[in-house]
Each structure stands twice: as structure tokens, then as C-alpha cells.
């Protein structure tokens, strides 16, 4: 399992894309998340997936995907809590909205297995217990469960 995350725009070289493709086609999993739901990182990651796997499409996993269930020894994460900064109109204190949602995980399937798993919402800061009022992502407990499911699921494919 190769884990990458970030918050800024990035670009891989042709050699890096080729090495990543070889790793994934050899059975590896690329697991990525966008720190604090950074749109810059998410756009860069999606572009790099199009360039690395031009014949594949990174698409959102459906709600009924086995990854979100406990069927394989993971957690039932079909509903999780997403923290989202509340918009402020004045100088009032910052607030967080907590929404019950289905996890947003995008994936690429190769030969019938999940080869790339990407969360456009933050997982890693929550896993590090770095909670910020400006950070859009899953609460710590749910981030741990979603991340665990990705790892457990990948190891059983």
C-alpha cells in the first residue's frame, strides 16, 4: 500500500507515473487523501490519475460497495460524520457543521480489484488528531474506520 496526501498542486514526472503504474499493476494499492479537502491537491491527483491510467476512470464508489460494509472484517461505514466549516457572515466565532453522509471515496478498478482509493475529504489530519475548524473532513473515529476499511479491503483482494 502506497499512501500519498497533500494540500497543494503537484505534478509527477513521466518516470514517476510509469513507476506508479508498474507498482499498481503488480498488485499494489495507491491510497490518497486531500488534506483538509484541498481542491488544489484533489485536482492535481485526479489529473495525475488520468495521465497514469488513461484507459481507466477514477470514479466515486457506489454506496453499496463492499468497502463500506463489515462483510470483509472491517467496519460498517455506510454512514459517517463529515465535519464542514460553517460560513461566517460577521466576526462571530468559527463553527463546524457535522453532517451524516456516505463516505466519498473515488477508485480505479484494475482486473476486478480496487487499485486506487482516493478521498477528496480529509482523513489524515483526523488520524493524527489534528482537528481544525477550517478543515473539511471526517471526524476522527470515522476517519480511522474508513482508513482501516481501505487497508483491510486491499489486503484481502
Labelled PLM ranges:
Residues 4-5, 10-11, 89-91, 96-98, ...:
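Mixed-charge, polar/low-complexity N-terminal
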Residues 1-4, 29-33, 57-60, 115-118:
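Structural recognition of the beta-strand scaffold that forms the well-ordered cores
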Residues 3-42:
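Short alpha-beta junction capping motif
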Amino acid at each position: 500500500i502506497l499512501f500519498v496526501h497533500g494540500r497543494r498542486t503537484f505534478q509527477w514526472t513521466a518516470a514517476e507515473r510509469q513507476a506508479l503504474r508498474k507498482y499498481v499493476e503488480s498488485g499494489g494499492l495507491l491510497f490518497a487523501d486531500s488534506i483538509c479537502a484541498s481542491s488544489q491537491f484533489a485536482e492535481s491527483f485526479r489529473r495525475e490519475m488520468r495521465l497514469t491510467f488513461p484507459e481507466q476512470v477514477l470514479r466515486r464508489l457506489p454506496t453499496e460497495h463492499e468497502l463500506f460494509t463489515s462483510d470483509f472484517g472491517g467496519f460498517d461505514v455506510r454512514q459517517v460524520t463529515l465535519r464542514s466549516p460553517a460560513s461566517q457572515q460577521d466576526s462571530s466565532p468559527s463553527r463546524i457543521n457535522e453532517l451524516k453522509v456516505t463516505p466519498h471515496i473515488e477508485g480505479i478498478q484494475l482486473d476486478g480489484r480496487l487499485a486506487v482509493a482516493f478521498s477528496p475529504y480529509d482523513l489524515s489530519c483526523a488520524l493524527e488528531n489534528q482537528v481544525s475548524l477550517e478543515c473539511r473532513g471526517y471526524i476522527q473515529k470515522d476517519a480511522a474506520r474508513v482508513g482501516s476499511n481501505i487497508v483491510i479491503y486491499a489486503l484481502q483482494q
